[in-house]
Swiss-Prot record:
Keywords: Hydrolase, Lipid degradation, Lipid droplet, Lipid metabolism. One of its GO terms (cellular component) is lipid droplet. This is Abhydrolase domain-containing protein abhd-5.2. InterPro entries: AB_hydrolase_1, AB_hydrolase_fold. It comes from Caenorhabditis elegans.
């Protein structure tokens, strides 16, 4: 049995931090101390049961976490419930890196629950779809894919090539929601879970940023080949937009149109942002960056859906209640996709290799459309200033949307997507005056 003194005694053992001189952590609230001891004990025991982690590896993890806690701890006070969480998250990151436990998601019933939650979300929206696993050569990875065929007898404009959707960080195919239904009025739609996310396999990617990015986009190309798609109208959201752009840079002949929905990773970090940070804030941010982004969601276990509901109560307005189970279950597996994102990012989510430095290399025969949410945390103003004047680039701002443009206003989003696609017969753009709200009446 893991004893609470194994780490608490280390926290209180010395009078000051060897580097910072910070005094011992003082806890005046007995309830906070009891909570910390109990929660830390439960979390670590759970980790040990699942991972069979060796003592030395975990001891090193403890000391690293404790050192960092002391480094940014100020005025001698820090709630131990946060210490418990930090140590547990650091432990998860350490054992995932060494792959001493696998898989996170060993229970078949949970895998089935994820598939069922996905099905209920899509069915509640009246979407008829084909679900399948497409195996690609990269480490025999299986890519979870759904296809929605165009069933409209007389679509307003029939796009020449299928529409392919690439989701963002921590998401999956089901979150495209009603946008899939509307897009399928014009062309067959394929949506897939990126490797390392959703229901797809969890292959181990390289820890080198350039190699990891290449592995991810080559996986997309292998998926396209297995799907027998000559070209694609490629739509990527957030992190998916970053990967879609990277894919188009390497495989421009396979992209008919590139539509970027509030893409992540385009702008360089604002130097003024870093300059404004205090030393304490920099230390805190450094600690946070050592964790897998969604580690806390896994650490809370069965409370995951409730945590998602508390953080995003608005999701119930766009999807069925199953969305909370879906997000939790989709991110309960070995987080290899998260590790790729973590590998490609720095300084709290800025891309190490921002697309602003590479976008000029994109073949200018590939039409690009940016669709941003006015209320998004993404800096769309800089993106628009950098690329808005290029002849092959269009930029749209949805004043009714935040970061999740496809869900915040699905009708407007689809109108902009379809308006950017070339007519397969004439090569002309779909007229902007097409009113999708009036035209889309046939349920799928």
């Amino acid at each position: 049995m893991f004893q609470k003194t194994d780490f608490l005694s280390k926290i209180f053992s010395s009078s000051s931090h060897p580097l910072t001189g910070s005094q011992n952590i003082v806890v005046k609230d007995p309830q906070t101390l009891d909570f910390a001891m109990q929660s830390q004990n439960e979390i670590v025991c759970s980790l040990r049961e699942r991972s069979h982690m060796n003592t030395m590896s975990y001891a090193q993890t403890q000391m690293m976490a404790i050192d960092e806690i002391r480094a940014f701890q100020s005025e001698g006070h820090l709630h131990l419930k946060y210490i418990s969480l930090i140590i547990a998250m650091m432990a998860e990151t350490a054992v995932v890196t060494s792959r001493s436990w696998f898989p996170y998601f060993s229970c078949p019933s949970k895998s089935q629950r994820l598939a069922e939650a996905e099905g209920r979300i899509l069915s509640a929206l009246g979407i008829k779809y084909l679900a399948r696993l497409i195996q690609i050569p990269f480490k025999n990875t299986e890519i979870s894919t759904i296809t929605v065929n165009c069933e409209s007898e007389q679509p307003i404009v029939k796009a020449k090539y299928p529409i392919v959707l690439i989701h963002g960080f921590g998401a999956g195919v089901a979150l495209w929601g009603s946008a899939i239904k509307r897009l399928a009025q014009f062309q067959t739609v394929h949506a897939f879970d990126l490797p390392g996310f959703g229901r797809s396999s969890r292959p181990k990617f390289s820890s080198d940023p350039e190699t990891a990015e290449t592995e991810m986009i080559d996986s997309i190309e292998q998926w396209r080949d297995k799907m027998n798609l000559e070209k694609m109208n490629l739509v990527g959201h957030s992190f998916g937009g970053y990967l879609a752009t990277s894919y188009a840079l390497k495989y421009p002949k396979r992209v008919e149109n590139l539509i970027l929905a509030d893409p992540w990773g385009f702008n360089e970090m604002d130097p003024e942002f870093a300059q404004k940070l205090t030393s304490r804030q920099k230390n805190i941010f450094w600690v946070i960056q050592q964790f897998n982004p969604l580690a806390v969601l896994r650490l809370v276990g069965g409370y995951g859906p409730s945590l998602v509901r508390r953080l995003r109560p608005d999701l119930a307005l766009k999807y069925s209640e199953d969305v909370y189970d879906y997000i939790y279950l989709a991110n309960s597996r070995d987080p290899t996709g998260e590790e790729v994102f973590k590998c490609l990012s720095e300084n709290l989510g800025w891309a190490k290799q921002p697309m602003s430095k590479r976008f000029h290399e994109l073949d200018n025969t590939v039409p690009v459309t940016f669709i941003h949410g006015e209320r998004s945390w993404i800096d769309w103003r800089t993106t628009r200033r950098l690329f808005g004047e290029l002849e092959h680039v269009e930029s749209h701002i949805m004043d009714s949307a935040g970061h999740h443009v496809y869900a915040d206003d699905a009708d407007k989003f689809v109108q902009l997507v379809i308006g950017s696609l070339k007519d397969g017969k004439t090569g002309e753009l779909v007229p902007e005056e097409v009113n999708l709200e009036e035209e889309i009446v046939t349920p799928i």
